[in-house]
Every structure is written in structure tokens, then in C-alpha cells.
């Protein structure tokens, strides 16, 4: 590709990195999560070095969250929630491109539902109410029995 354009300084952008993370998320490989997280970290390192166009965005994070949620790791839901917290912290610090959206929250809530700890799914659902509009999908993921408990708390 560099030869075709006579440019030897081609470098992948956020879209390229997101595609690689997405491939890992769909791979079902045992080490997919560690690879996806390493790519996310590398993107921040490259961005901090001053190279434009590689800063992770909400799509990047949601894809890493998806990779976590699809993993067979026992702590996947906890790790997904921790990554969601990182997104919220970065957003609150001024990075508007990483504001968690419906997809981000649904992935984390679904990860808790799969972990059989449905009560824990109420925590990200509550955070979601303060960050974005909720949808019926969140309540479906945490179960109808949890919906009444959630509604009575908030």
C-alpha cells in the first residue's frame, strides 16, 4: 500500500484499530481479551505520543467490552464494569468521544446477566439512568423480576 501511494509513513487510524479489536472479539480465542485490552492501551500510548487519529472512542471501548462479555472468564462482568467506569471517568474528565452509550451499558448489563449475578446488573443499569436514556433492552437483560426492584430504588 505504501508503494502504491509513494508514502512510506502510512499508519493505521482509530477505524483500523477498531477493526482489529472487533476481529479479536469475534475470534473466541482464549487470549482475545488480553489482545483487545493491549490494543486499547497501545492506542492511548500512540495518541499521547502526538500521533493524530488513533485516540480510542466509544466504539473502541464498546468493542473491548463486547470481547470481555463474550469471554468465558469468570470475572468478565466485573472487568467489563471496571472498563465502563474508565469510560465514565474519561468522559467526566472532558473526553466527549468516550461517553458510554446504550450499547456500552447493554453489553455490561448482559455480561452480568450471563454471570448469573443479576443483582449486580442493577448497578450499571442505575449508572445508565444518569448518563443516557434507558431502553427496554436494559430491563430485559436484567430480568423482569429485577425491573420492579430497580424502579422502586430510583
Predicted region positions:
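Hydrophobic packing position at a conserved site in alpha-helical tandem repeat units
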Residues: 1-6, 36-50, 80-94, 127-135, ...
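Positions within ordered alpha-helical repeat solenoids
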Residues: 3, 22, 26, 42-45, ...
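Alpha-solenoid ARM/HEAT helical repeat scaffolds used for protein-protein interactions
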Residues: 6-8, 27, 49-52, 71, ...
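Pentatricopeptide repeat
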Residues: 13-18, 22, 57-62, 66, ...
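Short coil/turn connectors between adjacent alpha-helices in alpha-solenoid helical repeat scaffolds
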Residues: 23-35, 68-80, 113-125
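Intrinsic disorder
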Residues: 104-105, 135-139, 144, 148-151
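Basic polycationic patches enriched in arginine
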Residues: 116-118, 149, 153
Amino acid at each position: 500500500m505504501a508503494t502504491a501511494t509513494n508514502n512510506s509513513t502510512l499508519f493505521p487510524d482509530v477505524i483500523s484499530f477498531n477493526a482489529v479489536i472487533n476481529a479479536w472479539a469475534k475470534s473466541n480465542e482464549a487470549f482475545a481479551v488480553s489482545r483487545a485490552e493491549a490494543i486499547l492501551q497501545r492506542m492511548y500510548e500512540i495518541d499521547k505520543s502526538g500521533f493524530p487519529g488513533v485516540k480510542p472512542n466509544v466504539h473502541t471501548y464498546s468493542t473491548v467490552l463486547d470481547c470481555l462479555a463474550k469471554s468465558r472468564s469468570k470475572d468478565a462482568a466485573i472487568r467489563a464494569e471496571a472498563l465502563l467506569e474508565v469510560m465514565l471517568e474519561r468522559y467526566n474528565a472532558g473526553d466527549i468521544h468516550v461517553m458510554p452509550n446504550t450499547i456500552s451499558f447493554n453489553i455490561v448489563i448482559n455480561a452480568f446477566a450471563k454471570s448469573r449475578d443479576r443483582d449486580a446488573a442493577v448497578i450499571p443499569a442505575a449508572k445508565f439512568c444518569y448518563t443516557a436514556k434507558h431502553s427496554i433492552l436494559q430491563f430485559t437483560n436484567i430480568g423482569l423480576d429485577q425491573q420492579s426492584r430497580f424502579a422502586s430504588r430510583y
